[in-house]
A protein has these predicted regions:
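ATP-binding glycine-rich loop module of kinase domains
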Residues: 1-42
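Conserved structural core of kinase catalytic domains
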Residues: 39-86, 136
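Catalytic-loop of the protein kinase fold
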Residues: 95, 99-111, 115
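Conserved protein kinase catalytic/activation segment
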Residues: 112-124
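Activation of the activation-loop gatekeeper triad in protein kinase-fold domains
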Residues: 125-130
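Conserved activation segment of eukaryotic-like protein kinases, specifically the C-terminal portion
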Residues: 137-151
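Conserved end of the kinase activation segment
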Residues: 151-160
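Helical subdomain adjoining the active site within ATP-dependent kinase catalytic cores
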Residues: 175-192
Length: 192
C-alpha cells in the first residue's frame, strides 16, 4: 500500500522475468478500460516502475481497495445463513459479469475477492487474468490449487477459467450456510 496525492494504491513489483509481461498487462488494461461495472479495479503497468541498485523492475499500480477478504467475511458471518446465501448470489453476478465481458480472473480464491461495505465485491491481483487479446498465450500461473480444477494446465487459458473456482466457492458457501460447524473443520486460513 502506498499513498500519493491523497490517493491509496496497491503496488506490485516484479523481481523476476515473466513471459510477455508488458504485452499481457497492456492487453488487460486496455480491455478493462472498456468494461463498465463495479467489480474490477483500474490498474496501470509501468515497465520502468522502480529502480534499485540491482536494476530496474516493472510494477503494476492498482487503486487501493478497502474491505475484507471473502474468507474474513465468511468467518464474520458464519452464523448468518442469509448473509452467506446473499454472498452466493453476489458471486454469481460477478461470475456472469466476467463471462459476459470475455474475462477470466485466473486465480479466483477468497484472498483475491474483496468484500466492501454493502457486500460489494471487487477483484484484485490480475497477474493470471485472461482477456480476449491474450488468447494466443498460455497462463502465467495456475492459481491457488484449492480452487482450481485438478486437470488445469498452463495451456488452459480462456474465458472459462473461473467457472470451476466459482462453483467451488458457491458450493462451500451453501454448505456453510446450512452447517456452520464445517468451517473450523475445513478452513485452513485465508486461501481455504
Amino acid at each position: 500500500e502506498i499513498e500519493t496525492d491523497h490517493r491509496k494504491y496497491a503496488l506490485r513489483c516484479f523481481h523476476k522475468r515473466l513471459d510477455a509481461l508488458h504485452e499481457r498487462y497492456d492487453a488487460i488494461t486496455k480491455h478493462l478500460a472498456g468494461v463498465k461495472g463495479p467489480y474490477l479495479v483500474a490498474c496501470q503497468f509501468q515497465p520502468q516502475g522502480i529502480t534499485t541498485e540491482s536494476g530496474t523492475y516493472p510494477v503494476v499500480r492498482m487503486d487501493w481497495v478497502d474491505g475484507q477478504s471473502l474468507a474474513a467475511f465468511v468467518a464474520e458471518h458464519l452464523q448468518d445463513s442469509g448473509a452467506l446465501q446473499q454472498m452466493r448470489f453476489s458471486l454469481r453476478r460477478l461470475a456472469r459479469h466476467l463471462r459476459e465481458n470475455g474475462i477470466a480472473h485466473g486465480d479466483i480464491q477468497p484472498s483475491n475477492i474483496v468484500v466492501q461495505r454493502g457486500a460489494n465485491l471487487r477483484l484484485i491481483d490480475y497477474d493470471g487474468m485472461f482477456v480476449p487479446a491474450l488468447e494466443p498465450f498460455c497462463s502465467t500461473e495456475l492459481g491457488q490449487r484449492n480452487f482450481q480444477h485438478p486437470s488445469r494446465r498452463r495451456r488452459h487459458f480462456n474465458a472459462s477459467l473461473g467457472a470451476f473456482s466459482f462453483s467451488v466457492i458457491d458450493l462451500a458457501l451453501d454448505a456453510l450456510s446450512r452447517q456452520p460447524g464445517l468451517w473450523p473443520r475445513t478452513a485452513s486460513g485465508e486461501d481455504a
